[in-house]
């Protein structure tokens, strides 16, 4: 559980009284109430601008000067991962704060187990961070990409599927090419053509800035999500950027064009040919070019916040729905794996109480964004969410999370799906994975497994699952089973608790017993009162320690 800042939840949680050797203390209720009083005294809740991009790998941040400046100005999460490295399942998780096994959105289309119509059909659109903030008095707006299969309608017949939780919106469906799309603007559909000013990222940037200007002028706290379709395939940059970086190549990292040792069967036949490498280099150049307009959008939004006088009271959050691989592990362009290329994405936050240049090492996930936004806004977040607020982490707090879950459903190629219909990269079969800071464990439904020691093998090249003990494997399988069934913040956090080794348990219990004996001796000394110490009498030995089972 996170320390320092508590998310408001519908159901109360029981707080365990820990032994003297337990985790750092949380602040008192009065200190939290003091923070809330300070916000109230200022007369304004903080605003939030959330920039969610599509398929952006961490290696693209290097080409985004505004985002790099945000890293210097605020907090960067060094171990932030998505729960599914595919667009729609990840976005469903971001909206709801729940793992894919709880949203049941596991693919991009209704035909295969996901998409907008399933999201809406399960009433998940009524239960998101947008509805939380709207209920807390926020003015909300979303621009760009919503969910796969969402349709805006046509100018003559606008869609009646207005997104719940959003006061304003400007949403497209087929915006991947950047031009020639319909945009549903608050129920009115406008067609944008192929003129330079019709480039989708620029259009949503302008509309977002206009929203900020109006909301700030009216003194309303606001949540704005800007969700460009880039750098997703087909990687179309703004015309002003299309001739830049002519000599750039996809990064030749240690795993580039290298086959994994003891790779699972779905990877065995992969090979990078000369033409494929050349094609990927061009694709990488295009991806970099598409990020330039995103970076400019963020710079323009920051300028508008300053002009509107609300920059000092606004959080800006930058992230991606998933990552992307280009040549690593001898795989051609794609995603959906459990490798870091696909599941580790940027999360950068600036705002009123975010110290400059903070690097957060604790594990974070896209299940956490809903709770984080609720925390910042003082909104009520349901206890049924799986995530927890990340806000305490940039102020020196910690969490006790040890692992994160990654889920994936292997899919048949669907020509209507932008993530499978145009893919040539192999799609992994069904798997579930545990991501730790120091290792990665993947279990496929066909029985194959992978285990990578990230301390000695940071590029995830040597699958050593055959070298770990049977006991360790059973422990990993039990952990994986537990977290795949978890629901709610408490369960999903503590389902991750890995048993310590027997020797570690014995040492910890000896320390706990010694502390208890010391407290008991103090309580029975002549100078002590007749009432036993609560720490010694009511706390069982080993309280708060992991089970050895």
Regions found by a protein language model. Give the residues of each.
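Active-site-proximal cap/lid insertion segments
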Residues: 35, 39-43, 58-59, 173-200, ...
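C-terminal cap/loop subdomain of S1 sulfatases and analogous C-terminal strand-loop tails that border
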Residues: 164-176, 322-328, 355, 367-370, ...
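Active-site segment of extracytoplasmic enzymes that catalyze sulfate/phosphate-ester chemistry
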Residues: 50-51, 58-141, 152, 174-175, ...
């Amino acid at each position: 559980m996170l320390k320092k800042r508590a998310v408001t939840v519908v159901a109360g949680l029981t707080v365990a009284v820990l032994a003297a050797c337990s985790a750092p203390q949380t602040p008192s209720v009065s200190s939290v109430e003091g923070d809330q009083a300070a916000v109230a005294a200022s007369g304004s809740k903080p605003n939030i601008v959330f920039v969610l991009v599509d398929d952006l790998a961490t290696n693209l941040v290097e080409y985004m000067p505004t985002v790099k400046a945000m890293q210097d100005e605020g907090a960067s999460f060094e171990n932030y991962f998505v729960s599914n490295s595919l667009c729609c399942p990840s976005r469903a998780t971001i909206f709801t704060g729940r793992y894919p096994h709880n949203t049941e959105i596991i693919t991009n289309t209704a035909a295969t187990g996901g998409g907008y119509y399933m999201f809406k059909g399960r009433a998940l659109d009524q239960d998101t961070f947008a509805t939380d903030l709207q209920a807390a008095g926020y003015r909300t707006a979303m621009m760009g990409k919503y969910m796969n299969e969402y349709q805006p309608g046509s100018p003559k017949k606008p869609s009646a599927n207005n997104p719940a939780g959003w006061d304003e919106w400007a949403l497209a469906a087929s915006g991947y090419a950047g031009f020639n799309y319909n945009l549903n603007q608050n129920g009115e559909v406008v067609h944008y053509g192929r003129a330079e000013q019709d480039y989708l990222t620029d259009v949503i940037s302008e509309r977002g800035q206009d929203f900020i200007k109006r909301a700030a002028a009216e003194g309303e706290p606001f949540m704005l999500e800007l969700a460009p379709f880039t750098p997703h395939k087909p990687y179309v940059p703004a015309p002003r950027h299309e001739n830049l970086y002519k000599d750039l190549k996809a990064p030749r990292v240690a795993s580039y064009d290298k086959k994994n040792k003891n790779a699972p069967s779905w990877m065995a036949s992969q090979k990078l040919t000369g033409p494929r490498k050349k094609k990927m280099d061009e694709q990488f150049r295009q991806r970099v070019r598409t990020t330039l307009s995103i970076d400019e959008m963020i710079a323009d939004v920051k300028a508008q916040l300053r002009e509107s006088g609300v920059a000092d009271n606004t959080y800006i959050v930058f992230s991606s729905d998933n990552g992307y691989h280009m040549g690593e592990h001898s795989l051609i362009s794609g995603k959906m794996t459990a490798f870091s290329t696909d599941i580790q994405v940027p999360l950068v936050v600036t705002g009123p109480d975010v110290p400059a240049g903070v690097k957060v090492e604790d594990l974070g996930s896209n299940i956490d964004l809903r709770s984080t936004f609720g925390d910042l806004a003082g909104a009520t977040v349901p206890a049924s969410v799986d995530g927890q607020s990340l806000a305490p982490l940039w102020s020196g707090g910690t969490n006790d999370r040890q692992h994160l879950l990654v889920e994936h459903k292997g899919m048949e190629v669907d020509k209507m799906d932008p993530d499978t219909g145009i893919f040539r990269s192999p799609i992994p079969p069904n798997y579930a994975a545990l991501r730790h800071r120091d290792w990665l464990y993947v279990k496929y439904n066909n029985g194959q497994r992978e285990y990578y020691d990230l301390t000695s093998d940071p590029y995830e090249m040597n699958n050593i699952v055959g070298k770990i003990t049977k006991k360790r494997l059973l422990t990993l399988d039990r952990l994986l089973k537990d977290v795949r069934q978890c629901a709610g913040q408490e369960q999903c956090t503590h389902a991750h608790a890995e048993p310590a080794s027997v020797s570690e348990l014995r040492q910890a219990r000896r320390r706990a017993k010694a502390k208890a004996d010391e407290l008991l001796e103090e309580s029975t000394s002549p100078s002590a009162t007749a009432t036993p110490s609560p720490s010694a009498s009511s706390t069982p030995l080993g309280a708060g320690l992991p089970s050895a089972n």
